[in-house]
């Protein structure tokens, strides 16, 4: 399939992945979208538009406009009267977007490198990407699109020609890394360090360690974890109970 299209994201699969109800012309169910965005200004021909309710603006108000711009299908939290195109009715567009990102990632034959840590995530992402680009077609997080909104949008940017995705993941509270790793399912997970960020939610560095290591819950089979052994907290991760894995592991210390 051409990189113009998002592999396996047909209207039917979008509805299934989002656990929503497809409403529209059923002859279009096998139509594959060409992109997915939350910003109505970025909509192009064949795109999926995902309206998000923000603090000041509800993206649903732009649904009529995006169909005029060429959107193929939209998500919606409420039924649309006289819709100009097909849509998938869901309880929460934000949650549906995350489910769709997880489905899309798993449908792709690609290796994913996940990167987290209190500091150094972006620099590490750029260095790893630079090395991998010498041999592979790499898709990487743009800017700091590393949260529960930015990560799915980054995943939606992956195309079939990409061989590796380098995804930055940032959190501020417990449970967030669990949700991010559910979407990204890393084959390699890098933790740069455990610092003092977001202690108002995580309590102390032990809390930061616990929150960051949620990333191991949804790694792919035979995945590899790369931890900074010079970090005193990460150096304590020597039993799998700390990294949410139930079977024995092999730990190897690499120095240079």
Residue ranges with predicted function:
Residues 78, 169, 249:
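Residue immediately C-terminal to the conserved phosphorylatable aspartate in receiver
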Residues 15-16, 96-229, 233-241:
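Phosphate-binding loop of NTP-binding sites
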Residues 24, 51, 76, 89-90, ...:
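Structural signal for conserved beta-strand scaffold positions within catalytic alpha/beta enzyme cores
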Residues 1-99:
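N-terminal leader/targeting and accessory segments in enzymes
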Residues 73-79, 86-88, 213, 224, ...:
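Generic alpha-helical hydrophobic packing signal
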Residues 243-256:
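Single conserved hydrophobic/aromatic residue that forms the stacking wall/gate
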Residues 71, 241-242:
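Structural alpha-beta junctions
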Residues 81, 197, 251:
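Active-site loop signature of alpha/beta-hydrolase-fold enzymes
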């Amino acid at each position: 399939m051409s990189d113009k299209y998002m592999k396996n994201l047909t209207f039917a699969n979008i509805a299934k992945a989002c656990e929503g109800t497809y409403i529209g012309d059923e002859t279009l169910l096998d139509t594959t979208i060409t992109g997915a965005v939350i910003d109505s200004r970025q909509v192009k021909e064949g795109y999926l538009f995902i309206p998000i309710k923000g603090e000041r603006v509800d993206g649903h108000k732009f649904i009529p406009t995006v169909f005029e711009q060429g959107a193929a299908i939209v998500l919606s939290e409420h039924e649309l009267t006289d819709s100009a195109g097909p849509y998938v009715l869901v309880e929460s567009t934000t949650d549906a977007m995350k489910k769709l990102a997880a489905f899309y990632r798993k449908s792709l034959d690609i290796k994913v490198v996940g990167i987290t840590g209190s500091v150094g995530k972006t620099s590490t992402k750029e260095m790893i990407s630079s090395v991998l680009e010498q041999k592979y077609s790499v898709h990487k997080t743009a800017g700091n699109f590393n949260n529960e909104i930015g990560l799915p949008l980054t995943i939606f940017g992956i195309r079939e020609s990409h061989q590796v995705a380098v995804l930055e993941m940032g959190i501020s509270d417990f449970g967030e890394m669990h949700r991010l790793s559910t979407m990204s399912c890393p084959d390699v997970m890098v933790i740069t360090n455990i610092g003092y960020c977001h202690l108002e939610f995580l309590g102390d560095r032990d809390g930061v360690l616990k929150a960051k290591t949620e990333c191991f819950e949804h790694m792919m089979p035979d995945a590899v974890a790369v931890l900074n052994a010079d970090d005193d907290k990460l150096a304590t991760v020597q039993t799998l109970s700390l990294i949410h894995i139930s079977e024995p592991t092999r730990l190897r210390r690499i120095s240079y």
